[in-house]
Regions:
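Conserved ABC ATPase "signature" region
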Residues: 96, 100, 107-125, 468, ...
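Conserved ABC ATPase signature
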Residues: 129-133, 501-505
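Catalytic Walker B motif of ABC-type/P-loop ATPase nucleotide-binding domains
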Residues: 154-157, 526-529
Length: 680
C-alpha cells in the first residue's frame, strides 16, 4: 500500500550460521504506534538495526519512507537499549550537541527545545547534569535527542526498562502526542501491560513473526477467558489445579489414563499461576470452568473466597502462544540441602500467632506464618541535609514475599541497603533474622541473599567462575557446589556455555545468573532489587516460580520492581513516596482502597480528547490506552456527564464508556499523585 511508511518483505539476517531473523513480513502505517514483543533473542533488536539503516539485511526487501533504510536515516530517530547520553553534560548541552550533529538551525533548535522540554516536563532542569537525572528523566532526555531532527519514524528499543510506573506512563503520554503529529513509532518492550497501549502488536519468536493484530484481535484469537480465584489455600489449590491440567494433557495424548480425575475436571483449565493473594486460571469456557473449579475445591475441602471472570491479558496471549511453540522454560527443582528459613522456629505457625493474638485469616497460607524475619522501626537515613528515608516501619515474616514499590528516588534501594547491613541508618532500629546488633557479621551475611539493581556479576569472569566465586563468598559446602552450579546453569539454559564471559550475555540472561548466584547458599532472607528488569515475560514467569518456591520453603523475600503487573505476585507490599511509607497491604487491599472509579471511554480523536481533559482534570487522571481513554473520577455519577459535555462541545463523540477495575499501576499512580497533591 502506498500509505505504508515501513514495508518489510521476506527479511532475513544471518550471523554466520545463526539465523537471527527468518523471512519476516510487516507493514506499518503513518502515525501508528506499533509494538514488537518477544523473548530475549527473538530478533527484535536485529530488526531495529536493519530498519535504522545501521545494518544490512542478508536477504529480503526493506523500504522505509519508500527508500532503503540507509537512505532514510535523516528521517529516522533511533533510541537504542543503551541510549547514548553524555552524563557529564547538562540537559541543554546534550540537546545542543545533538542538534549540531543533525545540523539543525538555531531558530529551529530553539523552537523545538522549548516545545519538547515543556512536553516532557524537563524545562525546570535544563542546567542539571545528565548523570544526576533519575532513570525516567534520562529516558525523556534520550527521547528528546532522538526527536531533535523531527523524524518521521521513531524506533524505540526497550526505552522504559528500569523506569518507574509514573515516568513510564508520562513517557507513553508523550509518545501518544508525538504519534498524533503524524510520527510513526515502532517500540520494543518487555512490559506487556504497556505494549497494550500500541495500536497494533507483533509477537516475534526465534526470528519469526508469529502473530500481528490489535490487542482486541490478539485476545479474541486466543479464544480463552481468565478466572481470578481467591483462597487461603493458595499452595495446595495451585498444586491441585496444575496436576489437573497435566492429567488433562495426558488424557488428550492417551485416551486412557490411570490418574484419578474425571473428564469434567480437565476440560477447560489451560494455565494456572499464583499472583500474590490469588490464582489466575486461563480457561476455555468461563461458566463451565468456574463450576469445575468449585467442584475441585469442594472435593479437596479447600477454602474458596471468591471467583471473578476477567479478560485475558496480553501476557496471557504471549505465554500461551510461546507454550504452543514449545518454548516454556523447564522447571527444575532447587537442590535443597537444609531446612527452609522458618522451619523449626519457636513460636512459628498458626498456633504461635494465635497465642500472640495475631490474625491468621488472610491471604497467606497458615503454614507460612512464622517469626518475623525483617523488622524496622522508625528507620531514617540522611545524606547531609537530604532525608532519603523518613521514619519507615516494616515487618516481613518468614515465608512471605513483600514488595517495596515506589518511583525512582523514593528511597527503596537505600532502605534495602540499610536492612541488609550495607548502610548504617541515621536513626531507628532493625532486626534481621533475629539479630539486632552486628548486622555486618559474616555469619549473618551467609544467611542472607542479595541481588542488587546493578548486576553483582563480574563481566571479565566466565559464568562458571562467577558462580564458583559466590559459592566461596557464601560458604556453600564444597560437596554440594557442583550440584548448585549445575542447577543454575540448567535453570538459565546455559548448560555447555558456562565458560562464556559473563559480559557477553544479554541483560536478561545476566539477571538469571545473578539470581542463581544469590540463592545457591539457601538464604533465610532474600533481598531482590529489581530482579526482572529487562527480562522477557517467559523468563519473568520462571523467576517468579522460583521466588514462590523459596518463599514456600520458608525464605523471607523483599523485592522491588517497576513492573506492577508482576508485583501482584507479592503477598503484601508497601508504597514509598519521597522516603516515606504511605500505604501497605495485599494487592487486593490496595486496589480496593482507591476512591472513585476508573472509566474507559471509546471516543473519536483520542489525542485531542486527552489534551482537552487534561486542562480540566489533573493530568495524571487521563491516559491513552491504544484507541481508548482511561479517566480516574472520584465522583463518577456527577463527573461523567461533565466529561461528556466537555468532549461533545468540542465535537468529540463519545461512542461508549464503562467502569473497569483499577490495576495495581492505576492504584500506585493514584496514591503517589494524591500524596504529592496533599503535600505530604
Amino acid at each position: 500500500m502506498k500509505d505504508e511508511v515501513i514495508q518489510i518483505r521476506n527479511l532475513s539476517k544471518c550471523y554466520g550460521k545463526l539465523v537471527a531473523v527468518k523471512g519476516i513480513d510487516l507493514t506499518i502505517a503513518p502515525g501508528e504506534i506499533f509494538g514488537l514483543i518477544g523473548a530475549d533473542g527473538a530478533g527484535k533488536t536485529t530488526t531495529f538495526h536493519i530498519l535504522a539503516g545501521v545494518m544490512e539485511a542478508t536477504s529480503g526487501e526493506v523500504r522505509v519512507l519508500d527508500k532503503k533504510p540507509r537512505d532514510a536515516r535523516l528521517y529516522t530517530g533511533y533510541l537504542t537499549q543503551k541510549f547514548s547520553l553524555y552524563l557529564d553534560l547538562s540537559i541543554d548541552e546534550n540537546l545542543r550537541y545533538t542538534a549540531g550533529l543533525r545540523q539543525i538551525s538555531e531558530k529551529l533548535y530553539q523552537e523545538r527545545r522549548a516545545k519538547y522540554l515543556k512536553l516532557m516536563d524537563l524545562d525546570r532542569f535544563s542546567d542539571r547534569l545528565a548523570g544526576r537525572l533519575s532513570g525516567g528523566m534520562k529516558q525523556k532526555l534520550a527521547l528528546w535527542c532522538a526527536l531533535i531532527s523531527r523524524p518521521k519514524i521513531l524506533l524505540l528499543d526497550e526505552p522504559t526498562t528500569g523506569v518507574d510506573p509514573v515516568s513510564r506512563r508520562e513517557f507513553w503520554d508523550v509518545l501518544a502526542a508525538i504519534a498524533a503529529e503524524g510520527v510513526t513509532i515502532v517500540v520494543a518492550t518487555p512490559y506487556l501491560d504497556e505494549a497494550e497501549r500500541c495500536n497494533r502488536i507483533a509477537l516475534m519468536h526465534e526470528g519469526e513473526i508469529q502473530q500481528v493484530g490489535t490487542l482486541a484481535q490478539l485476545r479474541d484469537s486466543l479464544g480463552l477467558q481468565r478466572l481470578e480465584v481467591r483462597t487461603k489455600d493458595l499452595e495446595t489449590a495451585e498444586k491441585t489445579l496444575v496436576e489437573t491440567r497435566h492429567v488433562a494433557s495426558g488424557q488428550q495424548r492417551n485416551e486412557r489414563s490411570s490418574q484419578q480425575a474425571t473428564k469434567t475436571d480437565i476440560t477447560d483449565i489451560i494455565d494456572v499461576q499464583t499472583f500474590g493473594d490469588r490464582l489466575d486460571i486461563l480457561v476455555k469456557h468461563a461458566d463451565r470452568a468456574e463450576a469445575e473449579v468449585r467442584k475441585i475445591f469442594a472435593r479437596q475441602k479447600l477454602d474458596l473466597k471468591d471467583i471473578q471472570v476477567t479478560a485475558p491479558t496480553l501476557e496471557n496471549v504471549f505465554v500461551t502462544r510461546l507454550r504452543e511453540l514449545g518454548d516454556e522454560p523447564e522447571s527444575i527443582p532447587f537442590p535443597r540441602l537444609k531446612s527452609g528459613g522458618a522451619e523449626g522456629r519457636r513460636g512459628g505457625g498458626a498456633e504461635g500467632l494465635r497465642s500472640r493474638g495475631e490474625n491468621t485469616d488472610n491471604q497467606l497460607s497458615i503454614a507460612n506464618y512464622q517469626d518475623i524475619a525483617i523488622a524496622a522501626n522508625s528507620l531514617r537515613k540522611d545524606f547531609g541535609n537530604f532525608q532519603a528515608v523518613k521514619n519507615v516501619d516494616l515487618e516481613i515474616r518468614y515465608g512471605e514475599i513483600y514488595g517495596l514499590l515506589g518511583a525512582n528516588g523514593a528511597g527503596k534501594t537505600t532502605t534495602i541497603k540499610i536492612l541488609c547491613g550495607l548502610l548504617e541508618p541515621t536513626a531507628g532500629s532493625i532486626s534481621l533474622a533475629g539479630e539486632t546488633n552486628n548486622l555486618r557479621s559474616g555469619e549473618l551475611r551467609r544467611r542472607i541473599g542479595y541481588m542488587s539493581q546493578k548486576f553483582t556479576l563480574y563481566d571479565d569472569l566466565s559464568i562458571l567462575q562467577n558462580l564458583e566465586f559466590y559459592c566461596g563468598v557464601y560458604g556453600v559446602p564444597a560437596r554440594s557446589r557442583r550440584q548448585k552450579i549445575d542447577w543454575v546453569l540448567a535453570t538459565c539454559g546455559l548448560v555447555g556455555k558456562e565458560n562464556m564471559l559473563t559480559g557477553q550475555l544479554p541483560g536478561g540472561w545476566k539477571q538469571r545468573v545473578a539470581f542463581g548466584a544469590a540463592v545457591m547458599h539457601e538464604p533465610e532472607i532474600l533481598f531482590l532489587d529489581e530482579p526482572t528488569s529487562g527480562v522477557d515475560p517467559l523468563a519473568r514467569r520462571q523467576f517468579w516460580r522460583l521466588i514462590n518456591d523459596f518463599a514456600r520453603s520458608g525464605t523471607a523475600i523483599l523485592v522491588t520492581t517497576h513492573y506492577l503487573e508482576e508485583a501482584e505476585q507479592c503477598n503484601r507490599m508497601g508504597f514509598m513516596v519521597a522516603g516515606e511509607m504511605v500505604t501497605q497491604g495485599s494487592p487486593s487491599e490496595i486496589k480496593a482502597m482507591q476512591p472513585g472509579q476508573l472509566i474507559e471511554m471509546a471516543i473519536d480523536r483520542t489525542q485531542d480528547a486527552s489534551n482537552l481533559l487534561k486542562t480540566e482534570l489533573a493530568s495524571w487522571r487521563v491516559s491513552i490506552f491504544g484507541d481508548r481513554l482511561h479517566i480516574v473520577l472520584d465522583n463518577p455519577e456527577s463527573e461523567i456527564p461533565q466529561v461528556r459535555s466537555i468532549l461533545e462541545n468540542s465535537n468529540i463523540q463519545v461512542h461508549s464508556w464503562r467502569s473497569i477495575p483499577f490495576s495495581l499501576e492505576d492504584s500506585f499512580i493514584g496514591i503517589v499523585q494524591r500524596t504529592s497533591e496533599n503535600g505530604k
